[in-house]
Amino acid sequence: MAKGKDVRVRVILECTSCVRNGVNKESLGISRYITQKNRHNTPSRLELRKFCPYCYKHTIHGEIKK
């Protein structure tokens, strides 16, 4: 029997550099990654360094609300 909500949830990580600078003319969009996290082990917002194809470098990608 199920105990309630799932422990693993799907989260979306968005490039903080693209969001902070805004989308300018040479940039085509904002980099987003979809991943999973365990709610019991990581109750706070997730932040990972990932490659942003729009900034052409590794930047911090933070969790956003759906």
From Swiss-Prot:
GO terms for cellular component: chloroplast; ribonucleoprotein complex; ribosome. GO terms for molecular function: structural constituent of ribosome. Keywords: Chloroplast, Plastid, Ribonucleoprotein, Ribosomal protein. InterPro entries: Ribosomal_bL33, Ribosomal_bL33_CS, Ribosomal_bL33_sf, Ribosomal_zn-bd. Signal peptide: none annotated. One of its GO terms (biological process) is translation. It is found in: Plastid, Chloroplast. Belongs to the bacterial ribosomal protein bL33 family. This is Large ribosomal subunit protein bL33c. The gene is rpl33.
